């Protein structure tokens, strides 16, 4: 077979005519310094603040500090494979996380990658982790209650959908338990819950996940975890990833609860990053924008107006105190951002008052707007009565010669403390809460010995399930108290069957 030169030249000419050159321009820089999870790169002149960049070994980073001659990049993954002189390129994208229904029931890291061993998350939708909070005209005032199932909270410091309520206290005072009970109580409430674990032990997160699974709460919960062994950038990003996942549902008109456990560790991680990129330290060595770190996160919690779909995002941030000092820097910052705080006190916790809520220092700035009518009626004076009891209790230790009125207040206060105690992971429906608090505030428990009050409560609930369904149904449907005569008769009828212990 002979090769014909004309055919070959015709083929070559055709290929030359069809050739199209595509020029790919990518903004590339060079790593000039690496260490402690931070890289400095030269040559990325047009990079945006917060933009994702990619290193030669496919590890991603985020531009944090834009300086005159170099860029400070936090590395979102293992940084041991990156070395000086390596190439780093812009992606043109800011940090995003996957969002959607597919995340429900999963445990993911702050980048949205699953860590529960159940395979990939099947979703194509993403949201940027930093997005503007809803504007003034896009919001409406908080008016729907978020029932926690915890009597002391629903009666004294009620939380509404769209509210930011800080849970503050020393370590080991039951902060996480309050959040878990609240999540468990959202079953059948049309609520998506997101639990963000920041700097927690892996074993603690595992326990939380198993508790949620045992109570069937993982069916409507997303767990975002950046454990203590993760690099500081992931601890810093975790709350923003959680709120971005929640916003997806909020803007679709659904109701979301996000728990940040806890923001003290996020602040410490951000302080670490800021010091590594040489930002000047301020009070307690935190950078100057530490307030903005938390305010821009918590302002994204809102109750949207009907025009925007009427969805809501409720935030329960945690802050850990040292020896009950709520006047430290991070606690005072977050107290000033949120719509109230629930203060858990270690003294109460160790004296077996659990949940260990200090009624005097806890407050909800939404208040009665986040309570049903029935609860407002029965719990109106409860806070003041409890505060007065704590004051009298201190004085009563010094003298036994007390007048009748003071003795009555002390007796009522002791019973109030007993009624507000609650077992772990046993949230109580609001209609039952209303009836036991009604019995307390109307004096029906005054002749019940203090040691029998909790047994009285348990047996009263069982009696209501059998004989008082019409009362419970009335509160459930109308949100108001039933006829007081019917209530009084029902409580008296139960008291006749209750046997006081000897």
Swiss-Prot record:
Location of region: Disordered: 115-137
GO molecular function: ADP binding; ATP binding; proton-transporting ATP synthase activity, rotational mechanism
Enzyme class: translocase
PROSITE patterns per UniProt: ATPASE_ALPHA_BETA
Entry EC number(s): 7.1.2.2
Residues carrying the site annotation Required for activity: 362
Membrane topology listed for this record: Peripheral membrane protein
Top-rank taxon, per record: Bacteria
Catalytic activity: ATP + H2O + 4 H(+)(in) = ADP + phosphate + 5 H(+)(out)
A Pfam family annotated for this UniProt entry: ATP-synt_ab_C
Location relative to the cell: Cell membrane
One Gene Ontology CC term in the entry: plasma membrane
Gene3D superfamilies named in the record: 2.40.30.20, ATP synthase alpha/beta chain, C-terminal domain (1.20.150.20), P-loop containing nucleotide triphosphate hydrolases (3.40.50.300)
SUPFAM superfamilies in the record: C-terminal domain of alpha and beta subunits of F1 ATP synthase, N-terminal domain of alpha and beta subunits of F1 ATP synthase, P-loop containing nucleoside triphosphate hydrolases
Record's keyword terms, sorted: ATP synthesis, ATP-binding, Cell membrane, CF(1), Hydrogen ion transport, Ion transport, Membrane, Nucleotide-binding, Translocase, Transport
Residues holding ATP: 169-176
HAMAP family: ATP_synth_alpha_bact
UniProt xrefs under PANTHER family: ATP SYNTHASE SUBUNIT ALPHA, MITOCHONDRIAL
Family listed: Belongs to the ATPase alpha/beta chains family.
Function text: Produces ATP from ADP in the presence of a proton gradient across the membrane. The alpha chain is a regulatory subunit.
Subunit structure of this chain's protein: F-type ATPases have 2 components, CF(1) - the catalytic core - and CF(0) - the membrane proton channel. CF(1) has five subunits: alpha(3), beta(3), gamma(1), delta(1), epsilon(1). CF(0) has three main subunits: a(1), b(2) and c(9-12). The alpha and beta chains form an alternating ring which encloses part of the gamma chain. CF(1) is attached to CF(0) by a central stalk formed by the gamma and epsilon chains, while a peripheral stalk is formed by the delta and b chains.
NCBIfam families (UniProt xref): atpA (TIGR00962), PRK13343.1 (NF009884)
The protein, known as: ATP synthase subunit alpha
Species of origin: Geobacillus stearothermophilus (Bacillus stearothermophilus)
